[in-house]
């Protein structure tokens, strides 16, 4: 989603290049233009999302819009679903070497989350040409149970 060569792609680089400390950084949401709160900025960093550049200005995404956009993208651009073994056969690559994000919050899945998909025979979803799954937080939120 990051557009603009020569511009910092993530919040860490943006802070470094602009000389603005993280605590003082102010970004607007690219979708709703609301200013991101400090926890939303931190979550944006943890999710390893790219800064979006419009007319030379950097934008992030608030938690509400990330969730909404994830649901919208899944409904509009879902292609098909496969078990882990099917994804690995299709891509000729282990899921552990692939960047697979949560389709709800967009966080990259870690090994434990990928293992959970494999061990519990949960499907991964091809959405907009990318493989997506559920992180432990969204998994528990959707299933109404604790993540462990």
Swiss-Prot record:
What subcellular locations does the record give? Answer: Host cytoplasm; Host nucleus
Q: Which UniProt keywords apply?
A: Activator, DNA-binding, Early protein, Host cytoplasm, Host nucleus, Host-virus interaction, Inhibition of host innate immune response by virus, Metal-binding, Modulation of host cell apoptosis by virus, Transcription, Transcription regulation, Viral immunoevasion, Zinc, Zinc-finger
Query: Gene3D superfamilies from the entry?
Result: E6 early regulatory protein
Q: Does the keyword Ribosomal protein apply?
A: no
Q: Name one GO cellular component term.
A: host cell cytoplasm
Gene Ontology MF: a single term: DNA binding
Keyword Nucleus in record:
no
Family the entry assigns: Belongs to the papillomaviridae E6 protein family.
Q: What else is known?
A: Belongs to the low risk human alphapapillomavirus family. The cancer-causing human papillomavirus E6 protein has a unique carboxy terminal PDZ domain containing substrate but low risk E6s do not possess this domain.
Summary of subunit composition and partner proteins: Forms homodimers. Interacts with ubiquitin-protein ligase UBE3A/E6-AP; this interaction stimulates UBE3A ubiquitin activity. Interacts with host TP53 and EP300; this interaction inhibits TP53 activity.
Protein name per the record: Protein E6
The species this protein was found in: Human papillomavirus 29
Gene name tied to this protein: E6
């Amino acid at each position: 989603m990051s557009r603009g060569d020569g511009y910092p792609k993530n919040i860490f680089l943006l802070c470094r290049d602009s000389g603005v400390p993280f605590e003082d950084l102010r970004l607007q949401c690219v979708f709703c233009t609301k200013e991101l709160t400090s926890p939303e900025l931190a979550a944006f960093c943890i999710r390893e999302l790219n800064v979006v550049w419009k007319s030379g200005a950097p934008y992030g995404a608030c938690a509400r819009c990330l969730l909404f956009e994830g649901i919208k993208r899944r409904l509009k651009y879902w292609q098909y679903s496969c078990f882990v073994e099917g994804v690995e056969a299709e891509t000729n690559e282990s899921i552990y070497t692939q960047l697979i994000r949560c389709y709800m919050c967009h966080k990259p899945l870690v090994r434990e989350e990928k293992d959970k998909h494999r061990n519990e025979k949960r499907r991964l979803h091809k959405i907009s040409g990318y493989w997506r799954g559920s992180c432990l937080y969204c998994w528990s939120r959707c299933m109404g149970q604790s993540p462990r």
